[in-house]
């Protein structure tokens, strides 16, 4: 009976220790993350996107470190000489013994992903030519992307093979459209030049500029990019370079202005007629 009471007392004391350590670790993680947030909020050393990326990384590192440390602590309470076993087996052997090769792969991939600055939190990306969305979280093991529909995707860093980033300094907008053979090319050029002038005025704050404040590549007619395309018409292309953050909104504005100008000047675009014959 006394032995049972002794074991119960020891077990209860360990439970108290476990809860105490869990609370301390939770508070420590919270304080570290909070300090990082306050530091970036009160300073302006780096860009906002990079600040959010670092915050995401610190949050991931502290959570993983606290969790692993807590697990080792709990095991050490119930396994005698766990520290000696850990030192003798080696950390690498224990990790492999737990079958965590995929974890190592994901963590290493995450480190290189962040170190090489392939993306930042808030960037719009395409991953592996399959997933499109805005980067919400960059962790040591996984990457979270929010699709336009609102769906949140979590991708293991080790599975990321290709990244297309739409938020690296600038983006070039190119719009191509087919005009009827019946239209005078010179008249089409004149209408498009007027449309480009309107775009450069309307989107002046979105244009990518050089160190002197001049537009790097204002909206202009790229030229006739195809003749007799698919036996239907002549292809004209308009292009311009904008800031990466304004790419999607600027693209919508470009299409709106071009369509409006072509319509107001009665420039005939292609129409596809479908002929249906009935047999008696």
Curated annotation (Swiss-Prot):
InterPro entries: LSM_dom_sf, MscS_beta-dom_sf, MscS_channel_2nd, MscS_channel_TM-2, YbiO_bact. It is found in: Cell membrane. The chain crosses the membrane at residues 15-35, 68-88, 94-114. Pfam families: MS_channel_2nd. It is a multi-pass membrane protein. One of its GO terms (cellular component) is plasma membrane. Induction: Induced by high salt concentrations. Keywords: Cell membrane, Membrane, Transmembrane, Transmembrane helix. Disruption phenotype: Cells lacking this gene grow normally in minimal medium or in high-osmolarity environments, and exhibit the same survival capacity as the wild-type strain upon a drastic osmotic downshift. They sporulate and germinate normally. SUPFAM superfamilies: Mechanosensitive channel protein MscS (YggB), transmembrane region (SSF82861), Sm-like ribonucleoproteins (SSF50182). Its main location: membrane. One of its GO terms (molecular function) is mechanosensitive monoatomic ion channel activity. The keyword NADP does not apply. PANTHER family: MECHANOSENSITIVE ION CHANNEL (PTHR30460:SF1), MODERATE CONDUCTANCE MECHANOSENSITIVE CHANNEL YBIO (PTHR30460). May play a role in resistance to osmotic downshock. Belongs to the MscS (TC 1.A.23) family. This is Uncharacterized MscS family protein YfkC. The gene is yfkC.
């Amino acid at each position: 009976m006394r032995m049972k009471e002794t074991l119960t007392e020891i077990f209860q004391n360990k439970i108290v220790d476990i809860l105490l350590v869990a609370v301390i670790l939770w508070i420590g993680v919270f304080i570290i993350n909070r300090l990082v947030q306050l530091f970036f909020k009160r300073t302006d050393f780096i860009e906002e996107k990079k600040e959010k990326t670092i915050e995401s990384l610190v949050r991931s590192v502290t959570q993983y470190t606290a969790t692993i440390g807590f697990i080792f602590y709990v095991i050490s309470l119930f396994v005698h000489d766990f520290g000696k076993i850990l030192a003798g087996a080696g950390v690498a052997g224990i990790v492999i013994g737990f079958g965590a090769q995929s974890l190592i792969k994901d963590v290493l991939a995450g480190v290189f992903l962040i170190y090489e600055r392939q993306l930042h939190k808030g960037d719009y990306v395409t991953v592996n030519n399959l997933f499109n969305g805005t980067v919400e979280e960059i962790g040591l093991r996984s990457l979270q992307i929010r699709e336009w529909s609102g769906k949140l995707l979590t991708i293991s860093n080790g599975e990321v093979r290709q990244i297309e980033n739409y938020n690296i300094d600038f983006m070039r907008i190119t719009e191509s459209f087919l005009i009827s053979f019946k239209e005078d090319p010179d008249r089409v050029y004149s209408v498009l030049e007027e449309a480009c002038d309107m775009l450069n005025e309307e989107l002046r704050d979105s244009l990518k500029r050089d160190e002197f404040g001049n537009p790097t590549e204002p909206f202009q007619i790229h030229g006739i990019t195809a003749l007799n395309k698919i036996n239907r018409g002549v292809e004209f292309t308009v292009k311009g370079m904008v800031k990466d953050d304004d790419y999607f909104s600027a693209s919508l504005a470009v299409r709106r202005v071009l369509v409006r100008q072509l319509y107001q000047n009665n420039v005939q675009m292609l129409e596809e007629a479908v002929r249906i014959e009935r047999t008696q």
